[in-house]
Design a protein with these regions (language model features):
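ER/Golgi luminal nucleotide-sugar-dependent glycosyltransferases, focusing on the catalytic module
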Residues: 1-267
Length: 267
């Protein structure tokens, strides 16, 4: 039984280059170091929607963010692992045995971050995965609902297309599962470990949803315009925000056995 974590980096950041199970992923010209994976260009089927609006490949990758790593893993699924994990830039999941799982967030300087990824942590992770189908960071309790929180800052068009995509593409999710968006608890930041077969299903559904949005939205790469009634300064970042909400929905709708562990924020 083996596991591998694939952090997504868009800027250089130190990490444990001797870890056997952490393989940082990067695109473009970011230099990460040894034991990392450079994601070659494999995005033509998705980039076509951006290209039609004159968006450069560089801007596409900036908009895509961590989804580039998830897409790469979906298309190049490693056969040597049973559990697949993804984390976003400067964030990690805590598997240090000496740190209680009920901790919320741990701020860690770079001098400590380079020590993460030990064999002892891997053993702890695999032990957790024997009893759970997914691991995420600890959930956030919102003042309002998941839906309200999103719509307070983001353009609404992509949110409603997200809902419609779930209903049109995946009828096995009944209407009651959509009530999760009215709840107030969500594992923000899209950091997780899945059993491999569940990762493949999660990623496959996510990219079907994104493509549905691309095919039906008014603009694939929106920019902030005078008079827009949302506060988000970079609305083209919606793929990551949709992915963040879909993770929580996917876990809840499929009634997965979940363990929450502390989030490590790398300073």
């Amino acid at each position: 039984v083996s596991a591998c974590l694939f952090p997504h980096f868009h800027k250089p950041f130190p990490y444990n280059q001797n870890s056997t199970w952490i393989k940082p992923c990067y695109v473009d010209d970011v230099e990460i170091g040894n034991n990392s994976i450079y994601i070659d260009w494999i995005f033509d089927d998705l980039y076509q929607y951006y290209e039609a609006e004159g968006v450069s490949k560089e801007d596409f990758l900036r908009a895509f963010g961590q989804q580039a790593t998830e897409y790469y893993l979906l298309k190049n699924t490693p056969d040597y692992v049973d559990y697949i994990g993804c984390v976003t830039y400067r964030r990690m999941l805590c598997f240090r045995p000496e740190i209680p799982v009920y901790e919320n967030q741990i701020n860690m300087p770079a001098s400590e971050a380079v020590k993460l990824g030990t064999e002892e942590e891997l053993k702890t992770l695999i032990h957790y995965m024997h009893f759970n189908e997914v691991i995420t960071n600890r959930s956030t309790f919102l003042r309002g609902s998941v839906s309200q929180q999103y719509l307070e800052s983001q353009p609404p068009e992509y949110w409603w297309l997200f809902h419609k995509a779930i209903q049109d593409l995946f009828p096995h999710y009944d209407k009651y599962s959509l009530h999760w968006f009215d709840e107030s608890v969500i594992p923000f930041t899209t950091n997780y470990f899945f059993r491999k077969e569940l990762f493949l299903r999660y990623a496959s559904e996510l990219f079907q949803i994104l493509e549905y949005i691309y095919q039906n939205c008014s603009k694939v790469y929106p920019t902030k315009q005078p008079g827009d009634q949302f506060s988000e300064p970079l609305p083209w970042r919606y793929p990551g925000f949709i992915g963040e909400r879909f993770l929580g929905f996917f876990i809840n709708a499929n009634k997965l056995n979940k363990l929450e562990v502390p989030l490590i924020f790398l300073q």
